[in-house]
Amino acid sequence: MKVFHLLLRRLTFTLLSLSLLIFHQSAPAETRLSGNHFLSAELLNLSKDLTMNPIALWLDQGSQIWQKDCQGCHQDLTQVRQSIVEFPRWKNHQLINLEDQIIQCFAKKQMVGLSTENQDVIALSTFLSDSAKGLKIKLQPPSEVAERKLWQEELNHGAQIYIQRQGRVNLSCTQCHDLNIGKNLRSDVISPAFLTGFPIYRQSWQTMGSMDRRLRACYSGVQAAIPPTGHRDLRALELFLKNRSEGLLWEGPSIRR
């Protein structure tokens, strides 16, 4: 009987995961609203004011890093723009996101031991994210059959995390970001979980933060065990969120309360 219930639970997770994937992939892009649609008038004005938007500080720093450490290899920024909207990507049998790629590139220049939230990493991520603004989000699954199967397993894993109740609060991602869109939670307006603009500047952080930091904050909010930065669960969840955002326009680094 235990085995039967376990199999039934897994089947339920699989069916729910597939239904989420199919629903969001089939929904027209114009019917899906990004987080920017739910900003207060104050934050929306701040995001549009280039003289006051704090993200400009990280853009300037990222531009300097690009010219100093990256331009010699990549030359034209337009050559890397498209790849920004394709992360997380499959590399060496695992998922990596934009910050992972930056850390790997820095390591080649003997800049080792950097974390995802390192200010140089975040600044360059902010600059590159901004360069891809306006492009359509489009993932690039691996072409090789065996690798594609592993990639799909990670996507399914992310979908299961999304619908799994977490922590002492016993909430799942879908309960907030699909079933309670537009409602207030701790002074924040709940938006759909479409990944269209990162890194983000959160006023409550007073700094820029990566997707990892935002997801880990959600784990903390529901009082669940928090995965370490770069954990497989975080990458799989990011892949799922990016997958359901396919077809939407990338908005670049964003501001939140």
Predicted regions span which residues?
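Short Cys/His-rich "knuckle" micro-motifs
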Residues: 80-84, 183-187
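Long compositionally biased, domain-poor regions of proteins
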Residues: 64, 158-163, 172, 185, ...
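N-terminal, post-signal-peptide region of Sec/Tat-exported proteins
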Residues: 50-78
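Surface-exposed interaction/gating patches
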Residues: 63, 129-184
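Post-cleavage N-terminal segment of exported redox proteins
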Residues: 3, 7-8, 17-57, 89-156, ...
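Short cysteine/histidine-rich metal-coordination sites, predominantly Zn2+-binding motifs
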Residues: 85-93, 189-197
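The canonical Cys-X-X-Cys-His
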Residues: 68-78, 124, 158, 170-180, ...
